[in-house]
Every structure is written in structure tokens, then in C-alpha cells.
Amino acid sequence: MMLLCACENYLDLTPKGATLLDNLTEIEYLLNGNYTNSAYEFEDLYVMTNDSYGKMANPSTVLANNIGLEYALMAYDESVDRYVYTNSNPHYSGYYSNINSMNILLARLDDLSGDIALKASLAAEAKILRAYWHYLLVNIFAAQYDAATADAQGGIPYVTDMDLEKVNEKLTLAEVYRLLLEDCSEKTINNLPDKAVNILRPGKAMGYALRAKIHLQMKNYILQQFLFEFC
């Protein structure tokens, strides 16, 4: 009997340095990005805004090859199916890893005790960050939004749960952008802190800025201009 009790005591111990995500303090850590993750290497994406060529090869070489994701981004070639390059791109897996962290937070939050306002704020931050990573994914690995073709154009999977066994189907562009706006709803933004907790976390300014960027991609220019005034 004494041996049994001793075993139970050892089983109840939490390993040093580990977290069970069983309280608000611990689960809040999921909102802080890991900058060693390849998902945060944005250099190659600067070409999309004509800022720089990042770590890419010589522009003449990339454009001459006429294939690959780097070529598609640099040449703004909409005829390239960017989705076929997802398996070999570290951004793709890295972004979905970050999305999974947000989904874990959202799935666990309701079961935790604590301040209701804080829980609402954490949920809002997770939804905004989830939308942010999906926004990057759809702009890198799918065609640009066109209202005339969005219902038929392939987009990306939009993952809103942490079921790792489920195969997430690729949605249409229209469905992806609908979910982006759903995650960036006015209710969600209102629950964000007026000022971000730290530079890794979203506040109201980021919420409005992201929603404005989504409307900009959708060519809803009046709404985009209105939202940018809140940033």
C-alpha cells in the first residue's frame, strides 16, 4: 500500500520545465511567438511588396527558370499553381504550426477558471493571430482574390480545431476570406486590449489593420480606408 501511494505521488508530479496549460497564466504563453521558428523568416516574402529580394538567388536567374514559388512571387505570375509547392516550403508548415497553437488555446480556454474579461481578451488575440497566419498563407500559396471567380478558385485549408488526425480540405478563396473576416469580426476586435501586451501580441490596432488588409485584398476599398483610420 505504501508503494502504491508513493507511485501515485510521483505520477502527480509535473516534469521540471513542462507546462500542462491548465491555467490562464500558462496558456497565455501560446500567444508569444517563437522567433527561432522558420515561420518568422519573412525575408523571402519582401519581394511581394518590392522591398527586397531576401535570400533568393539573383533575380535574373529566378525569372529565367520560369518555375517554382520564388519565380511566381517575383514575377507576380498568377498562372502558377503555388499550392503544389506547399510540401517543400518551410513557411507553410511553420504557419500552420502557429495556427495550431492558437487552436489549442481556443479549445482549452473554456475549461479554465479565471477572469472572464481576460479569457475573452486571450480568445480575441488567438483569433486575430489565427487570421493573420491564414492571411499570409492564402496570399503566398493561392491566387489573388477576385470576387468574380472566388467561389470557384482554390484557396487553402482554414484550420479552426486541433484535430491532428483530420485531413483539412482546401477551401475556395471565397470561403477562406469569409473565415478571415469572421475571425476579425468587430466583436473580436472589441475584446482586444487597447494597447498590445507586448510586441509579439495583437492589440486593437493590429485587429483593425489586419481587417483592413483583408478588405484591401478583396478590393473593398471604401471599407479598407475606413478601417485604416482606426489603426
Regions found by a protein language model. Name each.
Residues 7-54:
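Membrane-proximal, proline-rich intrinsically disordered regions
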Residues 68-141, 171, 189-197:
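Conserved, well-structured interaction surfaces
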Residues 99-102, 177, 184-185, 228:
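Inward-facing hydrophobic residues that define packing positions of alpha-helical scaffold repeats
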Residues 141-178:
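Short coil/linker segments at helix-helix boundaries
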